[in-house]
Every structure is written in C-alpha cells, then in structure tokens.
C-alpha cells in the first residue's frame, strides 16, 4: 500500500466562523493554527496546504489569564538605531483588537512560503460582523 500524498489542486477547503468572545487567547490560537494547517483532516500532508479558511469574530473580547493584560508586552523594531517599540496587551486590544490574535496564530504556523499561505486563510474581525457571508461559513465551536 502506497503512502497517500495530498495534491494542492484536489484539496477541499471549507469556511468556518469562530466566536472569540470570552475564549483564552493561546488556547484559541493553537486550535485555529491546527485547523489552518489541516491537521484535523485525514489527508493531512506536511508539505501541502490542506487547511481550511477560518473567520474569527469578536476578537476584541478575547481573554487572557492572570495579569497578562497589563504585563504581556509585544515588541517590534524599525531596524534603525533606538527603534525598539513596545506595547502592552491592554493597549494593543484598544488600538488594534485583531492584532493580538493574528500575532498569536502567526507564531504557531511554520515559517516560509507555506506558512504565509496558511496565514492568508485567517480572517480576523474586531466586532461581530464579517463580510464573508457569500462563502456560507459553518459555525465552529472551540
């Protein structure tokens, strides 16, 4: 019996919508990353993008445990001397609510072209509305 290898042109991708309200950031992000990779499917192949599209709504209401709202810090650098910027989770949620979940999921995906293709299938919205009604997404309870 030969080993099955999924072909990119034969992969069937579904659309799912996830409500992030009250969910813990890391636990939600790990499940989303797993589904973006396609690990929940029987035809999962590591070098082929077999994952589904994931729409996340209410990203502004995602929760973190303990004191992480005040203590968790996100860093970025402009590549110029003295260009290190930092922002806490609390301020990040106020300014760009989608960004915290996007960064958490992106860190759980592989690096390189395949990981970028998987990341492009993630759609995150701060509020309860999304503009992917035409794709008829199924509700995914995580």
From Swiss-Prot:
<dbReference type="InterPro" id="IPR005822">
    <property type="entry name" value="Ribosomal_uL13"/>
</dbReference>
<comment type="similarity">
    <text>Belongs to the universal ribosomal protein uL13 family.</text>
</comment>
<dbReference type="GO" id="GO:0017148">
    <property type="term" value="P:negative regulation of translation"/>
</dbReference>
<comment type="function">
    <text>This protein is one of the early assembly proteins of the 50S ribosomal subunit, although it is not seen to bind rRNA by itself. It is important during the early stages of 50S assembly.</text>
</comment>
<dbReference type="GO" id="GO:0003729">
    <property type="term" value="F:mRNA binding"/>
</dbReference>
<keyword id="KW-0689">Ribosomal protein</keyword>
<dbReference type="InterPro" id="IPR036899">
    <property type="entry name" value="Ribosomal_uL13_sf"/>
</dbReference>
<dbReference type="Pfam" id="PF00572">
    <property type="entry name" value="Ribosomal_L13"/>
</dbReference>
<protein>
    <recommendedName>
        <fullName>Large ribosomal subunit protein uL13</fullName>
    </recommendedName>
</protein>
<dbReference type="GO" id="GO:0006412">
    <property type="term" value="P:translation"/>
</dbReference>
<dbReference type="GO" id="GO:0003735">
    <property type="term" value="F:structural constituent of ribosome"/>
</dbReference>
<comment type="subunit">
    <text>Part of the 50S ribosomal subunit.</text>
</comment>
<dbReference type="InterPro" id="IPR005823">
    <property type="entry name" value="Ribosomal_uL13_bac-type"/>
</dbReference>
<dbReference type="InterPro" id="IPR023563">
    <property type="entry name" value="Ribosomal_uL13_CS"/>
</dbReference>
<dbReference type="GO" id="GO:0022625">
    <property type="term" value="C:cytosolic large ribosomal subunit"/>
</dbReference>
<keyword id="KW-0687">Ribonucleoprotein</keyword>
């Amino acid at each position: 019996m030969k080993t099955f290898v999924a072909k990119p042109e034969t992969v069937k991708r579904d659309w799912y919508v996830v409500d992030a309200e009250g969910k813990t950031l890391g636990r939600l992000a790990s499940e989303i990353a797993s589904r973006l990779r396609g690990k929940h499917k029987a035809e999962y192949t590591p070098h082929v993008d077999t994952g589904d599209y994931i729409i996340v709504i209410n990203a502004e209401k995602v929760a973190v445990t303990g004191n992480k709202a005040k203590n968790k810090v996100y860093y970025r650098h402009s590549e110029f001397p003295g260009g290190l910027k930092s922002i806490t989770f609390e301020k990040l949620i106020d300014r760009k609510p989608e960004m915290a979940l996007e960064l958490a999921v992106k860190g759980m995906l592989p690096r390189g072209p395949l990981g970028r293709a998987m990341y492009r299938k993630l759609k995150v919205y701060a509020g309860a509305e999304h503009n992917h009604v035409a794709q008829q997404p199924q509700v995914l309870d995580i």
